[in-house]
Each structure stands twice: as C-alpha cells, then as structure tokens.
Amino acid sequence: MAANAAQQAPTQNWPYGNNSSGEGPVHENPEWEKARQALASISKSQNSTKPSTNQTTQQAGQYQAAVTDSSAMQQQQYYQQWYQQNQQQYAGYPYPYNYYYPMPPYGGPYPPGQYGVPGGYQTPTTPTGQAPSMPTMEDQSSNYPPQPPPPATPQPPPQSPTSSDQPPPPPPPPIPPQPNAQYPRPPSQTPYSPNGVLPYSPTDSNPMMRGYNPGQIRPGYQGYQTPVYQPHQQQAPAPGLYGGAGRVDAKKPNNSNMNKGGQQLWQRMKQAPGTGAVKFNIPKRPYVMSNQNFPPGEQGPGLAPPTATNPSSGSTSATSSASTGGAQTRPQDWPQAMKEYVQRCFTACESEEDKDRTEKMLKDLLQSRLQDGSAYTIDWNREPLPDLKPKQSRWEVMPQLSQENSIGRGGATRGRGGARLGNYRNVFSQRSPSSSSSGSSRSSSRSPSPHSRHRDRSRHHRSDSGSQSDGSMSSDLRLSLTRRQQKGGRGRGAERERGRGAAGERGRGRGKANRGRRNMEDLASGVGKKRKGGNAGLDFHDPNREAKKQSRAARFHTKLRTEPLVLNINVFDLPNGTQEGLSWDDCPIVGTCQDITKNYLRLTCAPDPSTVRPVPVLRKSLIAVKAHWKSNQDYVYACEQMKSIRQDLTVQGVRTDFTVEVYETHARIALEKGDHEEFNQCQTQLKALYKDCPSDNVGEFTAYRLIYYIFTKNSGDLTTELVYLTTELRADPCVAHALELRTAWALGNFHRFFRLYQKAPRMAAYLIDKFVERERNIALRAILKSFRPSVSVEYVQSSLAFPDLDTCLAFLTGLGISFTPSDPSKIDCKVSSASLTTS
C-alpha cells in the first residue's frame, strides 16, 4: 500500500510561498519524512512492475501553455522544469500519494491560471489506465488546521490489462534528491475550462483518457461508481468536484473556508452530468434558431455534419456549434437553383406590398426546407412562385393607387434597400431590409424571434412574427405547415394562431378542403382581414379596373345622350395663365341689359353681357326695390332683387361706393326681417369693401358686428374685433353703445343691459331681439333668488324691459311662473325658482 502512495509523489508540482512567485518559507510536516523513507526503500521493486510509467517523462514535455504575459510564461517554465525533475526523481511511481491525501503548503491562494484565473497550463497525459494528478485544494490559506497523517496502506486503483503485456523497461539510474525535496509538492497547474472539462491532448495514446473526468471518485472509497468513458466526447464535471479534498476537518463543511474563487468554481461545476441544456455560441448574424440540427441522412452537400454531442455533457463546443449553425442558412451556401428561385420571386413582385409578402412567405418556406434538408433535393426550377393576389370581397372598397403607400403603411412611404444579396433579399435577416423614409420604425413580420410582436402595415392589424401565416405557396409548404400545427399545437405560436382564427382549418369548419384552402390564401393576403380597421392596407390596385368600368358602362351606351353634358363654368382660359380661380377683375364685362327688374339665377356658365345690367340701370333698380319694400314689405321679392343686383355688380367687377350702398341696404332689410344668414353674408362683404371704399356707415355696421358676436357668443371674434377698433370708431355713438352693451353682458349686469337695450341706436335693437329672451331668462332667475319670498310683476316688467304688462305676463306664464294665492300681482319666488330649475 505504501508503494502505491509512493507512485503518486512524482506527478505533483507545488509552489512555494503565498503565491506563484514562491515567496515565504514552508514548514514540513514531520510525518512526511517517514513516508519518504518508506517510499525510497521500495522504489526499486516497484519500478520493475510498472513499466508503463516511463511514458510520463515523455509526455511531460508536451505541454502547450496558453500564456499571454511574461509572468505567466515564467511560471510555465518554472513548473515544467520542476515537474520534469520530479518525474526523473520518482520515475517509478505513477500514482501520486497526495492525490488521496494531499498536503498543500502553508501559504496564500492559488497562483494565476488556476480555476479560471488567466494563465492556465495543459495537464500532462498519463499512461493507460492511470488517472492524472488533479488539484484537490479549495483554499490554501494559513487558517487550515494541520493535515492528519495518511493511512499506512491505501488501496490503489485497478491496473489496465494492457500494462502487463509490455516487458518491463530497465530501471532508470538513481537521481539524487532535489534541494527542496523535503517540501510537499503543489498540485499541477491545470487550466479550468469554461465547460467544466479538463482538456487533454488529442495525441494521447489512450482514448479512454480523452473523456476522463477528474471529478470521479476512485475505487476503494465510499460512494464509488464505475465510470463510463466515452471517447471523443466531453463530460460535465461531477457535483462533488474538489468537494472532499483539502486541509479541512471532515466534520466541518467545506464551504466554511472557501475563498471567492472556490465559490465561483463550485457554482459553475455543481450541476450534475446530463442535466445541463445544450448551449450554443450564436454567430454575429443568426439566420435560424439554434439547437436545431439536420438529420444525418437528409443533409445537403453544402452542410457540415452535426457535431456529436454527449447527452450527459453540460455544454457543447462553441466553435463547432457556431460553424454548424451558420452554415445551415447562410445565403452563400444555398444551392444556386434556390438563389435563382428567390430572385424570380422578387422579380415577379409589382409593388412594395408584394415584396413584403413574398419575403415573409420565403422566410418560412426556405427555413423549413433548410431544416428538413429538402432544399438540396427538390427541383427549384419547377417550384411554383407564390400567389400574392389575395381573395377580395366583392363588397370591399379598393384603395386608389396613390393611396396605397400612405394608407397601407400608416402614412410612411418606404424605400427598398438594406440587406440584399444580389437582386434578392436575405429573408432570414434579423432586421428589416427595407427602411422607413420618414424615420419611423416599420416593424413587419421579419424578425426570427417568435415571441416578439410587431405592427403590421395597417395601423389596426397585428401579426405574429414567428407564426406560419404566410399563405399557400405550394403543396409542400401546406404539408409542412400542417405538420407544424400537429406537432407544435401546444406552443405559443399555435395558441396565438388559434386565438385569431388563423390556424389552418381550425375555427372555420373542419373537413372542408375548399375552406381550408381559402384560409391558407387568406393567410397569404394578410391576417386580420375582418378585424377592426378594414383591409385598406392589404388591397392592390387593379390596372384593368378602369377598363372594366368602361366595359360595364358600355352596356348603357345606347341609352345615353349623343352629346356629353359639359359644364362650361370655369373652363375658359384665364388671362395671364393664372390657375388660382375665377377673378372678376381679370374678366371685365360690361352689361347691356336695360331691364329694371331681373330674376336671380345662379351662374352655370360664363356670364353673357346681354343678360347683365350696367351700373346706371342697377342704380334705378335699387331705387325701385327700396320703394317696393317700403310700400309692400315683401321680403321675398326684395331679397331676390337685391341678390340679382349684387350678382350683376360682381360679374362686372364693380367695387365702388354704389356697391357698398347695395350691401348696406340689403343688410338692413335682412336685419329688419330677422334673416341673420343674409345679414351675415352682407356683413362679410362690407368688412372687405370698407377697406377699399370707406363709408359714413362704418361705425353703424361695426356696432352691428359686435352685437352679432354677442348673439353667437363668439368670444374669439369679438376679442379680435375689439383689438382692431380705432379711436375714431370708439367715438362713434353706435360703436360706443355696442361696447357698453358688451360690458354689461360680460359682467352679468342685467339692469344696465336692458336699459341699453331700450336705448339702442338705429337698428341695433333688431339684433338684440335675437338673444334678448335668452338674457331675460337668466335675469329672471337672478331676480327670484334675490327677492324671496315674493316679487311684484311690475318690477319684473320694468327690469326686463318689457313694453307692457300683458307681454310680461305672457312671458312669465310660458316659463311656468307661480303667483301668490293672496295676491296674483306678485310672484312666488320659492315655487317659481324650482320650476325654472327643472324647465
């Protein structure tokens, strides 16, 4: 047993001091001197029975150290030289004694390069059937208690059967002990792999050691299980790696004295073998989802064979996975026929919507073909192009061609550019190949992520970026979609498809092939056709639409008039080539009609001078209309004649004082009869005419305009009018009265308001009559609240400016005012207030 322990001593290298620089003295355990004497006594006999250990010296020089700085290079040279010296000194003892009972030095933490620290070193290979030396320390601080003495006879592991077939080599010459042989040797510098697996040289003669897991328990100890070695595969470390080693009492937990590096190593290596998920190193531009390999028998010639992975391993080689995943869908590795097929698909597109729909269809089609390997076996030259014309309802309003770029895309006109390969797009690009010229994000369903949702071309349409809702391109695509729905019907994509009624034939009648095919075609035209917002963004303009309309209209050609009806208004050429509209100043016309009266007719063609009256005739007509109005008060006749006079002045371009007089006369007649529509039209024309032809009645009609704004409660125009009032206009009696009336109305001073109403100049009272009843209702509520319990009717009559008592009583009765039973001449304020509130 002691011989077995002696074989382990030459394979360990230990630093001296607190760090890799070897500073600080190290004290020797007295028990180790006895062990060395026992090892030296049996070195010759053991050396003859273990010939295979001679490989250790040869393989010790095969280290490939990944050293990046000068200090790490010095450490490599130091440990390599020290390791070779120890192998020469203890060449006949392949099993290190301190693997089972390690004795680290009293000192500081691990040197750089151990457990994830930069500057790792390769572990030397060992003969067949022998385990390499492993560091078993979690902490090397000086707080550890002394190491207990090792047992006398440890049980060695079973020897490989191949080692006994070789003749024993001659024993090496004795080597004098090293100067520091009394110190225990440190563990070998072994780089820590990110996957938790110790790398070994691929040139190792023993294939069993390539998948060797140093965390396995050795035979002869409690909890040992027979390891299963798998060549050319990596294994995840055992949960208890380095767990029971170190200078720690068995009764105390190992994590009590762990340093920070040991805790991180334990968290990374505590996962059991076989329970970790396969991890992939995603390339710079992922084209397909990871963790999807082709079956071995269906791979095309351009695909690399998938790397065999061990089911029990916790990770996969990042290089192999990245190269395999990138080669699956890189457009450079596509078959030439498939590239030409993609180019033909985009060439057949007529609009940007067709390109977007084609790109979405090709993404799912090519991805499914590349995954099942059929992309390298089918004939792409005979593959039919996708059908992009959607099924449109006969009741659906098709958008105009000029509106397609604005309605279908939310107002943003998109250019086509970005990631293209030749003349076709990269349909597996993660970002959209087309960008929005307006700067807004146009998210179409091109992202490979199945969990992200983007806004569709219509602002009310939503579509899933990872769903198989791209329509029927061919029978193979339809079958592949059916297989996906049957297999992944419980996934998120299928649930969202079922939620919007787009998962094949489900939700629209089972067992009907026609409806199933219609569903697939509806998916090609866009999801959510019946949703809120319509389908304006997904319709396409038919170039033959107008021709079809004309052909349908030709059925009634015999019933139409022989000559088309042409309206000649505004069709004559305007002078100076102006296209801003008809201006009567640019088309001077002098009338020749001598009729005093003329019916008013709207113009439907260019004015005829023979039907237009000149200005002298119009003056006579105005005098006749005034006389007829005073004698007959026929407003219909007067209004028709005044509008006829205004029309003749307009077509001749007459804007003189006579024009102002005509509009003022018409405004007064309309105001007297209460036609505020015609009055408002005349006021608008007078406001423009007063700038060119000032009149003595500017103040009068300015006051009418202010009172009219009070009637309409147009505070904005009223404020604007007050701003432009000059000092001369404010001094005008009509304007001054209108300003006082506005102030009383704005302040709610009803007493002053009705006093001004009774003193209104000229025709201002006609305008106030338009809203005086409204103001009387508000004033009556205020009176009833102020004069409880009763108020006389005479006071109300005088306060509200009624002309007589009968008119006041009629007004009060209409509002439901209650009078006191004892005195009918008084109003019951309490009861009347309630009736006014409810009315």
From Swiss-Prot:
Comp. bias (Low complexity): 53-66, 120-132, 305-327, 429-450, 465-476
Skewed-composition ranges (Basic and acidic residues): 25-36, 492-508, 539-549
InterPro entries: PCI_dom, SAC3/GANP/THP3, SAC3/GANP/THP3_conserved
Biased composition (Gly residues): 408-420
Region Disordered, residue ranges: 1-75, 106-262, 287-332, 400-553
Biased composition (Polar residues): 10-22, 40-52, 223-236, 253-262
Disulphide bridges: none
GO cellular component: nucleus
A Pfam family of this chain: SAC3_GANP
Domain PCI: 675-839
Pro residues bias spans: 145-189
Domain of life: Eukaryota
Coiled coil: none
Bias-annotated ranges (Basic residues): 451-462
Name of this chain's protein: Leukocyte receptor cluster member 8 homolog
Source organism (scientific name): Danio rerio
